[in-house]
């Protein structure tokens, strides 16, 4: 038992597992030697002795791969205001349990007003850094005091374990007992150990604390009928709905079930499955919700520390504001529009040079697009920065936002709103200065602007957009300008040159979009972050140069977005922000809006704000080598001559898995499956020219790969990447027959040019190709296991006492598996550690699932020769089977054709692509499935879309009246689009058709 007094410091926070006991003994010894006579230096105020007893842990998260965790608790006393650590101690380690019992006591001399205690639970790992199991941050100002005169029952409190960052996976409670020692006139320290021998508990005098304890100890509500709670082999709790044969991560409640019908529940689960497989890029950064902790606890600032979120967007740190401190599940469209506006404002000059030096000198300056000439910029005199204002549609923040001092004086010209001043430039032209938000404009402000001027440009000078003058510019890179101090001092800066080039001829005649050439798809350096430049390699491949760090990369920096920006809702067309510099928006004589690029002197109908890669999606990486392999592969696939013309299946949607299994496995001659597929759904009228078959593959994929059936399970790192369940035989006695069926379905998909809707771990594809699985393949599947093996590879593992065997846990029982004959008697040394690592990888990915994989390959090779598949590598095989998950709208638009009166410049077509660009990633995938029958894109993009008669580009055909909804022909990749009269009408009915369409009634 030790008394830890401030200041006691531990220098090395990254302790190895063999250093911790030694440091702990030194810390305890130091604290006990100085327990008397040490002047308290932890802060101002009265100090008291706090007794802390770490009782136990309840239902901790499972971190070990082969069994339960080895938890211990680290206690840190720190100053709340300064975040400075004063003392650090820890408990002993309890082996192989998720409900450890420590029953260890510690004494701290604390200042209740400004000290806090941080309890961190870790899983001891002999190979790598200890795993984090959760933390509790406790303020010390409201803890009870022991009363030695009363009969004291043993009291405690269960604290909910909290995550340290948004990626932490924690669960369970930490049971603690904390109270101050009674004040006995300086005898506290001397008698503390004597009192401890006699005391067995004390009374909590805070009634609120007891009430909160009672509330937290209540058991969770019972599960609804038909639900079951289970724990997978990774220790994650999930819930099984036996009513509709589905699984989910969150705990259901009786209220949720009673409020919705079975059909609604099934639909919700299906939509969740759609998002899980389609939005691979968003779910992988899925933010784990943090449960709220009751009991009147104070704020826990440790939860806001998130290094992952800070590192996610470091390449854009100069152009973006800091990420939010806490995880965000949804963001308002206004915030998204501001983010898009900030990205659209970062534009290089004509030479591709960024003005990063200007931004670095003044990171908090606000740069807006300029709409005055260089002469006006030199002569415009601006007062000191004004008070903080709301960001308007035309504002762009470069760097972090900082509040500015209030304005000292305001010049107001009679007849103008408050804060506005009329001036003339050197050429005698009149312009107007808004001292409220430090902007200038050529347009004379009207009096209605007075009430908006001081409060912050909520409408700013964009109000003149509503004036009914067809030929006057509506917006020229936003008709306002912010002249910051660095801009005035830059004689020949890139911004000044851009301003000069933008408005060298402000009175240019209005061009007609009808006569202007169609914009060419050329390489552009627009929207690159500051300090970045794009160049073309000799082989024609673009690469990017970061002049800030003097590095080059093939990856487009514009596609690296913070985590909280990757799952956004659909954009609102009114929240897109200002136009890029040098662009102007005008209205044609027929009322349509078009855009002028004064930089390249071209006009177009497309809104340039919607061409940002952040909105359109990543470009499709064309692979010439893959194309050649695929053409060779298709050429070698021969259809037998002595088979029927087509293979027919008539199925029910609600029983598609079992019916497909019985029908396909009843075929004794696999060559029959190479005939043309003809799928019909019961009670639906649809001719299958390819579209219904794609729908069948999509629906069947969701059922085959559903972990509910026990054939597959999620990998250790996420809940969407699949791997074979090594215990599938315990879930289904006929599991090998089902794996043969799944192999046949996969072979059918590849043979007929269709795609599966599922993602497997990379070793799965390597096993199909018969390739050796390496340690690097482990990293993407199980990072913790990878780090452990990596540590063994880089260090001498002799001191770990490892043997050539592995402990495997199945349903609570632990079995020892020898990696080689008599492996339990062979020690891992520095000489044989590579053999040990290879055997562990072989056991982890191959040996446990060898029977299942052989059955899968048996069905797969019945339709496709394995030698022909081996011309692809594992990455190409994944694309061959599953396609691409992202939708590049620019590529989609470029490879589309129009019929029956539609053309690329038709207003309805312009509105259609605008609606697609304003959709979020999920809605684009659903639109793609609506028009093609699948949610996957071929390897080389939309140029290789296939229809019923071979290659068939996406087609939009004019059809019907404006009152009708759009309809799709998935067999021909065609969308019948009525000639709607407004953009809002088109967008509403397109979304209605996409979100509510199911089946093939009346549509082939």
UniProtKB/Swiss-Prot annotation:
SMART domains: C2 (SM00239), HECTc (SM00119), WW (SM00456)
Function according to Swiss-Prot or TrEMBL: E3 ubiquitin-protein ligase that mediates the polyubiquitination of lysine and cysteine residues on target proteins and is thereby implicated in the regulation of various signaling pathways including autophagy, innate immunity or DNA repair. Inhibits TGF-beta signaling by triggering SMAD2 and TGFBR1 ubiquitination and proteasome-dependent degradation. Downregulates autophagy and cell growth by ubiquitinating and reducing cellular ULK1 or ASCT2 levels.
Compartments (UniProt record): Cytoplasm; Golgi apparatus; Endosome, Multivesicular body
Active site: 971 (glycyl thioester intermediate)
Keywords: Cytoplasm, Differentiation, Endosome, Golgi apparatus, Phosphoprotein, Repeat, Transferase, Ubl conjugation, Ubl conjugation pathway
Organism listed in the record: Mus musculus
Post-translational modification: Phosphorylated; which impairs interaction with SCNN. Interaction with YWHAH inhibits dephosphorylation. Aldosterone induces Ser-477 phosphorylation by SGK1. Auto-ubiquitinated. Deubiquitinated by USP36, no effect on NEDD4L protein levels. Both proteins interact and regulate each other's ubiquitination levels.
PROSITE patterns listed in its UniProt record: C2 (PS50004), HECT (PS50237), WW_DOMAIN_1 (PS01159), WW_DOMAIN_2 (PS50020)
Top EC class of this enzyme: transferase
A GO biological process held by the record: regulation of sodium ion transmembrane transport
Gene Ontology, cellular component aspect: glutamatergic synapse; Golgi apparatus; multivesicular body; postsynapse
Segments forming domain HECT: 669-1003
Residues annotated as domain WW: 221-254, 414-447, 526-559, 577-610
Residue ranges of domain C2 in the record: 30-154
Predominant place of localization: cytoplasm
Official protein name in the record: E3 ubiquitin-protein ligase NEDD4-like
Annotated tissue distribution: Highly expressed in liver and kidney. Also expressed in heart, brain and lung. Isoform 1 is expressed in kidney, lung and gut. Isoform 3 is ubiquitously expressed.
E.C. number(s) listed in UniProt: 2.3.2.26, 2.3.2.36
Residues found modified as Phosphoserine: 341, 371, 475, 477-478, 493, 504, 508, 512, 516
Comp. bias (Polar residues): 347-359, 366-376
Domain notes: WW domains are involved in recognizing PPxY motifs in substrate proteins.
GO molecular function annotations of the record: sodium channel inhibitor activity; ubiquitin protein ligase activity
SUPFAM superfamilies per UniProt: C2 domain (Calcium/lipid-binding domain, CaLB) (SSF49562), Hect, E3 ligase catalytic domain (SSF56204), WW domain (SSF51045)
Modified residues (Phosphothreonine): 347, 396
Complexes and interactors: Interacts with UBE2E3. Interacts with NDFIP1; this interaction activates the E3 ubiquitin-protein ligase. Interacts with NDFIP2; this interaction activates the E3 ubiquitin-protein ligase. Interacts (via WW domains) with SCN1A. Interacts (via WW domains) with SCN2A. Interacts (via WW domains) with SCN3A. Interacts (via WW domains) with SCN5A. Interacts (via WW domains) with SCN8A. Interacts (via WW domains) with SCN9A. Interacts (via WW domains) with SCN10A. Interacts (via WW domains) with CLCN5. Interacts with SMAD2. Interacts with SMAD3. Interacts with SMAD6. Interacts with SMAD7.
């Amino acid at each position: 038992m030790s008394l830890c007094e401030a200041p006691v410091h531990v220098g090395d926070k990254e302790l190895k597992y063999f250093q911790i006991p030694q440091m702990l003994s030194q810390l305890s010894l130091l604290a006990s030697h100085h327990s008397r006579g040490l002047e308290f230096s932890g802060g101002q105020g009265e100090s008291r002795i706090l007794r802390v007893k770490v009782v136990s842990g309840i239902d901790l998260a499972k971190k070990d791969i082969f069994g339960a965790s080895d938890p211990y608790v680290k206690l840190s006393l720190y100053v709340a205001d300064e975040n400075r650590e004063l003392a650090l101690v820890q408990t002993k380690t309890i082996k192989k349990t998720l409900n450890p019992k420590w029953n260890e006591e510690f004494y701290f001399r604390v200042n209740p007003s400004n000290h806090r205690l941080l309890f961190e639970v870790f899983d001891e790992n002999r190979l790598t850094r200890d795993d984090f199991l959760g933390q509790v941050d406790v303020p010390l100002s409201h803890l009870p005091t022991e009363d030695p005169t009363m009969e004291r029952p043993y009291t405690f409190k269960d604290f909910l374990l909290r995550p340290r960052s948004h990626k932490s996976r924690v669960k369970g409670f930490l049971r603690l007992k904390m109270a101050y020692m009674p004040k006995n006139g300086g005898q506290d320290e001397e008698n503390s150990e004597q009192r401890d021998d006699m005391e067995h508990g004390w009374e909590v005098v805070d009634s609120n604390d007891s009430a909160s304890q009672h509330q937290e100890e209540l058991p969770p509500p019972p599960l609804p009928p038909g639900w079951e709670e289970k724990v997978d082999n990774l220790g994650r709790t999930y819930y099984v709905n036996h009513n509709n044969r589905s699984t989910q991560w969150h705990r259901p409640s009786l209220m949720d079930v009673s409020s919705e019908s079975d059909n609604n529940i099934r639909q919700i689960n299906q939509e969740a499955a759609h998002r899980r497989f389609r939005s691979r890029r968003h779910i992988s950064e899925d933010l784990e919700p943090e449960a709220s902790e009751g009991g009147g606890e104070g704020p826990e600032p440790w939860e806001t520390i998130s290094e992952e979120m800070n590192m996610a967007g470091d390449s854009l740190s100069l152009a973006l504001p800091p990420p939010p401190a806490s995880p965000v599940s949804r963001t308002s469209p206004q915030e998204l529009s501001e983010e898009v506006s900030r990205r659209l404002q970062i534009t290089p000059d004509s030479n591709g040079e960024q003005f990063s030096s200007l931004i670095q000198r003044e990171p908090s300056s606000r740069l807006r697009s300029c709409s005055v000439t260089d002469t006006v910029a030199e002569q415009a005199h601006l007062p000191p920065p004004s008070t903080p204002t709301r960001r308007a549609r035309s504002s762009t923040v470069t760097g972090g936002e900082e509040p500015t001092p209030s304005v000292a004086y305001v010049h107001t010209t009679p007849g103008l709103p408050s804060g506005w001043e009329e001036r003339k430039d050197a050429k005698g032209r009149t312009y107007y200065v808004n001292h409220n938000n430090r902007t200038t404009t050529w347009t004379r402000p009207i009096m209605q602007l007075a009430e908006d001027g001081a409060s912050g440009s909520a409408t700013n000078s964009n109000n003149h957009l509503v004036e009914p003058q067809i030929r006057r510019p509506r917006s020229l890179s936003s008709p306002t300008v912010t002249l910051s101090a660095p801009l005035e001092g830059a004689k020949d800066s890139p911004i000044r040159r851009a301003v000069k080039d933008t408005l060298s001829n402000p009175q240019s005649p209005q061009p007609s979009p009808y006569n202007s050439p169609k914009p060419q798809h050329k390489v552009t350096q627009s929207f690159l972050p500051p300090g970045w430049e794009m160049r073309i390699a000799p082989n024609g491949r673009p690469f990017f140069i970061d002049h800030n760090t003097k590095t080059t990369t093939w990856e487009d920096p514009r596609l690296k977005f913070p985590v909280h920006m990757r799952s956004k809702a659909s954009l609102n067309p009114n929240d897109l922000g200002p136009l890029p510099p040098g662009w102007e928006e005008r209205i044609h004589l027929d009322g349509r809006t078009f855009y002028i690029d004064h930089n390249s002197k071209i006009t177009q109908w497309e809104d340039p704000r919607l061409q940002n890669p952040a909105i359109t999606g990543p470009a499709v990486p064309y692979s010439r080598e893959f194309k050649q392999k695929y053409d060779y592969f298709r050429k070698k696939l021969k259809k037998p001559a002595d088979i029927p013309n087509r293979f027919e299946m008539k199925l029910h949607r609600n029983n598609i898995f079992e019916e497909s299994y019985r029908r396909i496995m009843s075929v004794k001659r696999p060559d029959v499956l190479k005939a043309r597929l003809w799928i019909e759904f019961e009670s639906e009228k649809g001719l299958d020219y390819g579209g219904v078959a794609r729908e069948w593959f999509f629906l069947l994929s969701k059922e085959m790969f559903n972990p509910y059936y026990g054939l597959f399970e999620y990998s250790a790192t996420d809940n969407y990447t699949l791997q074979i369940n090594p215990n599938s035989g315990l879930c289904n006695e006929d599991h090998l027959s089902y794996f043969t069926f799944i192999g046949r379905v996969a072979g059918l998909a590849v043979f007929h040019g269709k795609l599966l809707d599922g993602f497997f771990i990379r070793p799965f594809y390597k096993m199909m190709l018969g390739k050796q699985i390496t340690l690097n393949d482990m990293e993407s599947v199980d990072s913790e296991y990878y780090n452990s093996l990596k540590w063994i590879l880089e260090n001498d593992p002799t001191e770990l006492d490892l043997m050539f065997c592995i402990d495997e846990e199945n349903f609570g029982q632990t079995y020892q598996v020898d990696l080689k004959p008599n492996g339990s008697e062979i020690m891992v040394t520095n000489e044989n550690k590579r053999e040990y690592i290879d055997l562990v990888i072989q056991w982890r990915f191959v040996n446990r699932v060898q029977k299942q994989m052989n059955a899968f390959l048996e069905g797969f090779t019945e339709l496709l020769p394995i030698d022909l598949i081996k011309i692809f590598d594992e990455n190409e095989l994944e694309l061959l089977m599953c396609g691409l998950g992202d939708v590049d709208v620019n590529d989609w638009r470029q490879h589309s054709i129009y019929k029956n009166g539609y053309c690329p410049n038709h207003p309805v077509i312009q509105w259609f692509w605008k609606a697609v660009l304003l959709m979020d990633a999920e809605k684009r995938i659903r639109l793609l499935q609506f028009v093609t029958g699948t949610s996957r894109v071929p390897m080389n993009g939309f140029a290789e879309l296939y229809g019923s008669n071979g290659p068939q580009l996406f087609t939009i055909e004019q059809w019907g009246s404006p009152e009708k909804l759009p309809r799709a022909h998935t067999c021909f990749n065609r969308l019948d689009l009525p000639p709607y009269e407004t953009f809002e009408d088109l967008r509403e009915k397109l979304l209605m058709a996409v979100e509510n369409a199911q089946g093939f009634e009346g549509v082939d």
